């Protein structure tokens, strides 16, 4: 009897660590985006962060609002999602401060900031 080749199986499981998995700046978004997100149209930039553990999103908002003229557009402490609003330079600086502080001070793994 001929032996059948065995199939290796791999189970991948996400185990959250201390991570900033998304840090993105949307400069001058379209008005439709503001409307769909329920954000004020008076700002010129949106910053988006996704952080684990999700409780660190509260720390991220504290860092961001203390860094300059940004507002919290949305904070979900259960999923780690953060949306910041303000002018482009203020939101960009806030994202830099959040990723730097979480990365260097708190030893999170932080992704680079992306921009559109």
UniProtKB/Swiss-Prot annotation:
Compartment annotation: Bacterial microcompartment
CDD domains reported in the protein's UniProt record: BMC_PduU-EutS
Uses: Artificial BMCs can be made in E.coli by expressing pduA-pduB/B'-pduJ-pduK-pduN-pduU-pduT (in this order); pduT and pduU are optional, while pduA, pduB/B', pduJ, pduK and pduN are essential. A construct with the reversed gene order does not make BMCs. Ethanogenic BMCs can be made in E.coli by targeting pyruvate decarboxylase (pdc) and alcohol dehydrogenase (adh) to them. PduP(1-18)-Pdc and PduD(1-18)-Adh strains targeted to the BMC (PduA, PduB, PduJ, PduK, PduN, PduU) make significantly more ethanol than strains where Pdc and Adh are not targeted to the BMC.
BMC circularly permuted domain residues: 9-108
Annotated PROSITE patterns: BMC_CP
GO biological process terms on file: propanediol catabolic process
Keyword terms of this UniProt record: Bacterial microcompartment, Transport
Taxonomic superkingdom: Bacteria
One Pfam family in the UniProt entry: BMC
Cited InterPro entries: BMC_CP (IPR044870), BMC_dom (IPR000249), CcmK-like_sf (IPR037233), EutS/PduU/CutR (IPR009307)
Any GO CC annotation of this UniProt entry: bacterial microcompartment
Pathway as given in its UniProt record: Polyol metabolism; 1,2-propanediol degradation
Family: Belongs to the EutS/PduU family.
Biological function: A minor shell protein of the bacterial microcompartment (BMC) dedicated to 1,2-propanediol (1,2-PD) degradation. May selectively transport specific metabolites. Not absolutely required to make artificial BMCs. Proteins such as this one with circularly permuted BMC domains may play a key role in conferring heterogeneity and flexibility in this BMC.
Notes concerning its domains: One side of the hexamer is concave which is lined by hydrophobic residues, the other side has a slightly protruding, 6-stranded beta-barrel.
Subunit structure and binding partners: Homohexamer with a central pore lined by a beta-barrel. Hexamers pack into a loose array. Interacts with PduV, probably via the beta-barrel, which is predicted by modeling to be on the exterior of the BMC. Interacts with shell protein PduA.
PANTHER family hit by this protein: BACTERIAL MICROCOMPARTMENT SHELL PROTEIN EUTS, ETHANOLAMINE UTILIZATION PROTEIN EUTS
Name listed for the protein in its UniProt record: Bacterial microcompartment shell protein PduU
